[in-house]
Amino acid sequence: MQLQRSKDNMASHAKPIVILLADDDEEDRMLTSDALEESRVVNDLRFVEDGEELLDYLYQRGRYSDPDAAPSPGLILLDLNMPKKDGREALREIKADPNLRRIPVIVLTTSKAEEDIYRTYDLGANSFITKPVHFNALVDVMKEIGRYWIEIVELPSGAPHR
């Protein structure tokens, strides 16, 4: 027996989710946003600039204390090299918290270091993707992320905040 889904059928199964992008580089945030838009991965995209702000968002602290300002993400795109608290530290805290650990975290970074790959998977990352250099390649990556994480897999509904 062969299982096939048409693109239309898959698109009808896509559920809108909040995508939270944690990246300190404004240009990378805008390129990723443009690539998501170009790839037609239409969702609610939110930005944070470092690991501390990411955790503030997830725990609804500080400027994110209003639940409308920080809806629960269905997916986190995480850069590793950020100021204040880097992506590795933030990932460790997210995956150690029973209220947050189910949120899929995709590491999206310029690193190709094998040490980073092993370490982030050991910390609980769901995927490790090296940021493509060319915009069209980034669009292709965003299409595949959207296809897999939004159209194909079943994600838990928003993780409860503390």
Stretch-by-stretch model annotation:
Residues 80-82:
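Receiver (REC) domain active-site loop signature in two-component systems and cognate sites
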Residues 126:
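Short, glycine/charged-rich "phosphate-handling" switch motifs in NTP-dependent
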Residues 84-85, 94:
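Hydrophobic residue at a beta-alpha junction
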